[in-house]
């Protein structure tokens, strides 16, 4: 089954949208929302209206909780006007401290949002370069309190454009071949697959996979390949797939 895990808006991803239009790949409106639920506390809310903010009714009487949303307005308005040209060495965490923002806002809003978008632990979220954070939020309209961009996803999901690309390839194509290793020599490149030590022979090979996977299948990688590919960090991530009525 295909799940819509990729979302995009038309202004931020013009090349991707052009690709969809050129290949007559249909997209449909989707919803990208943000919610927080902190285990062991009464903190629970989402960004959709008063009912979403006070999804846990007990927080109607929680002054610290209510202050979060006033700080959101203040922080978003200020951040949307900040020039980050001279802030290359500043982190998000240090900026939040300078702004004297409450722990409720930091721990229950902005850090969870950053951690969710980039799939990172809260401590690492605070170490994010401020200029990267500001530019990303500006480009994606996330500082806007109103009129945020409409998000879209591919109709029938990624299989649609994968099949479209494959149909346009003039040569042979093979799917579901587990690549074991790639060996280069002066004459050609051998791509080994499966359990029987079978291989394809090519003049050139392009690896369109994650850096750690690429490094693991390249036989005798060069020093440059090792130095570049080993610096990409990965972590296991836990996702919850759900549907709402």
Where are each of the predicted segments found?
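Mobile amphipathic helical/loop "lid" adjacent to a hydrophobic cofactor/ligand pocket
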Residues: 7-135
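Short acidic-glycine loop/turn motifs at beta-strand connectors
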Residues: 38-41, 186, 195
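Glycine-rich FAD pyrophosphate-binding loop
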Residues: 1
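A residue-level signal for conserved active-site and pocket-lining positions in enzyme catalytic cores
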Residues: 20, 96, 114, 165, ...
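Helical element adjacent to the flavin cofactor pocket in flavoenzyme catalytic cores
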Residues: 133-193
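Central helical "cap/lid" subdomain
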Residues: 178, 184, 191-245
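Short, well-ordered alpha-helical microsegments
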Residues: 16-17, 162, 214-215
């Amino acid at each position: 089954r295909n799940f819509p895990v990729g979302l995009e808006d038309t202004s931020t991803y013009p090349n991707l949208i052009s690709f969809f239009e050129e290949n007559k790949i249909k997209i449909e409106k989707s919803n990208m929302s943000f919610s927080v639920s902190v285990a062991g506390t009464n903190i629970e809310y989402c960004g959709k209206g008063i009912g979403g903010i006070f999804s846990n009714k007990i927080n109607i009487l929680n002054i610290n909780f209510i202050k979060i949303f006033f700080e959101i307005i203040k922080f978003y308005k200020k951040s949307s006007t900040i020039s980050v040209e001279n802030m290359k060495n500043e982190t998000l965490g240090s900026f939040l401290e300078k702004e004297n923002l409450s722990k409720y806002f930091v721990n229950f809003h902005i850090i969870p949002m950053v951690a969710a978008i980039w799939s990172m632990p809260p401590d690492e979220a605070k170490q994010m370069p401020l200029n990267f954070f500001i530019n990303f939020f500006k480009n994606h309209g996330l500082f806007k309190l109103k009129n945020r961009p409409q998000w879209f996803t591919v109709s029938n999901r990624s299989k649609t454009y994968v099949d479209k690309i494959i149909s346009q390839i003039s040569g042979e194509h093979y799917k579901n071949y587990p690549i074991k290793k790639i060996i280069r020599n002066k004459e050609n490149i051998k791509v080994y697959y499966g359990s029987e030590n079978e291989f394809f022979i090519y003049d050139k090979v392009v690896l369109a996979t994650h850096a750690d996977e690429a490094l693991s299948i390249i036989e005798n990688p060069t020093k440059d390949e090792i130095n570049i590919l080993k610096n990409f960090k990965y972590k296991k991530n836990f996702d919850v797939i759900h549907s709402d009525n």
